């Protein structure tokens, strides 16, 4: 198992900026001292994900996920700790020597996670073989010539890892088998198919191969394109598998993430070749859906990274319809600013770039974008005879409904003037009609509500039920946390951040346990951490804790604000508060028992419990809580 020197881990942790790293995955906005955005770990419409540049941690107040820069990448990208340190170093352009093992160690991972890792590894190896066959062998020569004739450079082929699957049934089958890979698992992964006789064979044959990556940058599927015959579908995609879902996958999304973030916009295209040609032309923020219409999952993925989308679909009728559907989804569901780049009829971006050149494409890309309203107004003309009075009135009414959705009065005035000029109407007449549309739009917005998908509640069980609503609300709590929860938080936070405080609190606690199991478990981890001779460092402690839920608890504690100076007196008060609460809870349980014995007319136990309650009351009233 690969290990990294502690000083290298410290160097990477101290020099990396968590806001910069997470900003490649989440659209972050400054909010006070922290940054907020939509959580990448659960679906939400309202930001509850917070990143602290001061503490270099993240925490989601919706699902409870949290940690530091390493645990973010481990959770989001499915990396090992060593892999996460290396990726942070690479993303931060740090010159450190970190070597990864040639084969990924999955022995300590759960079976499901281990199989997922193996399926991804199979795809990575297969992609390398396909690319080698295309670039270096006689079998790939015809496909290589075809791609070059389409204007694709070898640099782009290497960048996108484009390959070729030869016309044999066992190229990948034997390749994986020789490496000791499980062929049944390869079938589950979508690389192989099972024949009627039970034999496993290659799924892709005689096709140019486009590797598909997930949003973590891992190859998890392929799309194979025919190029020299028509005896099958033009494109053959990997089937739905445990690691690949078309509804959640955008081609080139991971690779385009940095450009999307830098330019603060994403470009949506229909085909792989469109994206590759756009990349070569200098448009590096382009992605494409996997032969499907844009889905809600795609839209949510986009929304996490940017608020602006440029739709650049094919210029034919089908492309215009697809642009309308995609834009409607992005505008109405995700509130994105959408623009449409309409190409000449019959041209897709790849065709246009090859025919007119990269410079011309970049020119229209920058200068000829239509606003979503302009596109909709043009789209509404479809299949209407504007010489017919009924169609004309209906068209104008539909246009006014769209104009009413605009927030800026100047924009509304601009489109009203265009309508007035085209149909020889006065702006005053249109404004009167617009007022009614504005009222209707306002009512629609008031009545419109978004239902957020349910979150994974596995972490929520770790949070005290009576405090979960306050603890995981992104807004400032309207009431204070309970005294015992505040006590547990402050004691744990103080112990994590200062070894002397840990020793003092440990002595003061004695045999007293934390009331909530999650705090007691974290306390046990902390005892072991300090017993190994470690210094007080919440980040190092977080890295040492294997449980993701505990990492989230640590990050939530780091978000807690503590008084400037805390010492023995304050710690004793916290512990008294904790002991008092535990006694009060014990009293409540006894009172419930007393009521039960009373109903059963069990006098002996009733008297016994009454005496125990009296003793607890004496302790509570006297302040002698031990």
Swiss-Prot record:
Protein's GO biological process: DNA replication, synthesis of primer
Residues annotated as domain Toprim: 264-346
UniProt binding sites for Mg(2+) 2: 314, 316
Pfam family, one: DnaB_bind
Cofactor remark: Binds 1 zinc ion per monomer. Binds two Mg(2+) per subunit.
ZnF start-end (CHC2-type): 39-63
Reactions listed under catalytic activity: ssDNA + n NTP = ssDNA/pppN(pN)n-1 hybrid + (n-1) diphosphate
Uppermost EC category: transferase
One CC-aspect GO term: primosome complex
Record family assignment: Belongs to the DnaG primase family.
Protein name: DNA primase
Species whose genome carries this gene: Listeria innocua serovar 6a (strain ATCC BAA-680 / CLIP 11262)
Name of the encoding gene: dnaG
């Amino acid at each position: 198992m690969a290990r990294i020197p502690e000083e290298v881990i410290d160097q990477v942790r101290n020099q990396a900026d968590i806001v910069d790293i997470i900003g490649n995955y989440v659209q972050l906005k400054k909010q006070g001292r922290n940054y907020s955005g939509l959580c990448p770990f659960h679906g939400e419409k309202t930001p509850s994900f917070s990143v602290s540049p001061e503490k270099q941690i993240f925490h989601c107040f919706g699902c409870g996920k949290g940690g530091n820069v390493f645990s973010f990448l481990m959770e989001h990208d499915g990396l090992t700790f060593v892999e996460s340190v290396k990726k942070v170093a690479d993303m931060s352009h740090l010159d450190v020597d970190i070597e990864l093992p040639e084969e990924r160690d999955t022995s300590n991972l759960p079976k499901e996670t281990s199989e997922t890792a193996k399926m991804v590894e199979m795809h990575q190896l297969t992609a390398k073989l396909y690319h080698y066959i295309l670039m270096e062998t006689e079998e790939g020569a015809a496909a290589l010539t075809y791609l070059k004739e389409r204007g694709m450079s070898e640099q782009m082929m290497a960048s996108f890892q484009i390959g070729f699957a030869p016309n044999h049934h066992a190229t990948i089958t034997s390749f994986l088998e020789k490496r000791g890979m499980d062929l049944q698992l390869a079938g589950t992964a979508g690389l192989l198919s099972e024949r009627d006789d039970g034999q496993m064979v290659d799924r892709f044959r005689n096709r140019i191969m486009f590797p598909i990556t997930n949003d973590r940058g891992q190859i998890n599927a392929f799309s194979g394109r025919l190029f020299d015959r028509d005896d099958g579908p033009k494109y053959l995609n990997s089937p739905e598998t445990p690691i690949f879902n078309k509804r959640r996958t955008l081609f080139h999304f991971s690779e385009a993430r940095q450009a999307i973030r830098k330019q603060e916009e994403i470009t949506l295209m229909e085909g792989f070749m469109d994206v590759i040609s756009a990349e070569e032309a200098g448009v590096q923020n382009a992605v494409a859906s996997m032969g499907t219409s844009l889905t809600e999952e795609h839209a949510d993925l986009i929304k996490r990274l940017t608020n602006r989308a440029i739709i650049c679909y094919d210029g034919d009728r089908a492309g215009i319809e697809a642009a309308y559907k995609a834009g409607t989804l992005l505008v109405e569901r995700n509130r994105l600013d959408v623009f449409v780049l309409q190409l000449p009829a019959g041209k897709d971006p790849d065709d246009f770039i090859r025919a007119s050149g990269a410079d011309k494409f970049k020119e229209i890309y920058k200068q000829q974008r239509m606003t979503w309203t302009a596109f909709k107004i043009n789209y509404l003309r479809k299949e209407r005879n504007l010489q017919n009075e009924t169609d004309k009135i209906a068209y104008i009414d539909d246009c006014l409904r769209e104009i009413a959705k605009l927030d800026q009065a100047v924009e509304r005035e601009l489109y009203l003037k265009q309508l007035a000029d085209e149909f020889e109407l006065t702006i005053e007449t249109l404004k009167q009609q617009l007022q009614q549309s504005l009222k209707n739009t306002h009512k629609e917005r008031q009545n419109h509500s978004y239902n957020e998908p349910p979150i994974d509640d596995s972490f929520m069980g770790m949070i005290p039920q009576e405090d979960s609503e306050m603890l995981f609300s992104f807004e400032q709590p309207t009431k204070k946390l309970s005294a015992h929860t505040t006590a547990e938080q402050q004691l744990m936070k103080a112990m994590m951040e200062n070894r002397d405080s840990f020793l003092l609190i440990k002595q003061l606690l004695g045999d007293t346990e934390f009331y909530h199991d999650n705090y007691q478990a974290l306390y046990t981890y902390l005892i072991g951490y300090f017993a190994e001779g470690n210094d007080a460092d919440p980040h190092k402690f977080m890295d040492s804790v294997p449980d993701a839920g505990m990492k989230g608890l640590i990050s939530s504690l780091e978000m807690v604000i503590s008084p400037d100076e805390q010492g023995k007196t304050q710690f004793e008060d916290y512990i008294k508060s904790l002991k008092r609460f535990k006694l009060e809870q014990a009293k409540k349980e006894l009172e419930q028992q007393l009521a039960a014995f009373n109903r059963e007319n069990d006098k002996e136990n009733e008297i016994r419990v009454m005496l125990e309650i009296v003793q607890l009351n004496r302790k509570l009233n006297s302040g002698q809580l031990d």
